């Protein structure tokens, strides 16, 4: 059976243990919810670009009233824009992670 003095000693020993830091030396943890907002903004941008491009290409299809051929590039252009935007945002995020959070 554990008495009160032993429980107090165990609690004091647990409080004196160093905290575990999962970040490498010199790297500061990201502040509160700022990182989540940054990632949500990037996700919105990455999803909005292809949708906007598809809308523009769709309106071009309806206004021209002509048959679409695979050589028009109307399907591949939004995908290319989305991939390029996603790659650019990932590159910018990597740079800001190295330099410290600016958002």
Curated annotation (Swiss-Prot):
It is a multi-pass membrane protein. Coiled coil: none annotated. Residues 10-20 have a biased composition (Basic and acidic residues). It is found in: Cell inner membrane. Its main location: membrane. GO terms for cellular component: plasma membrane. The chain crosses the membrane at residues 42-62, 73-93. Keywords: Cell inner membrane, Cell membrane, Membrane, Transmembrane, Transmembrane helix. Residues 1-34 are annotated as: Disordered. Encoded in the E14 prophage. This is Putative protein YmfH. It comes from Escherichia coli (strain K12). The lineage of its organism: Bacteria, Pseudomonadati, Pseudomonadota, Gammaproteobacteria, Enterobacterales.
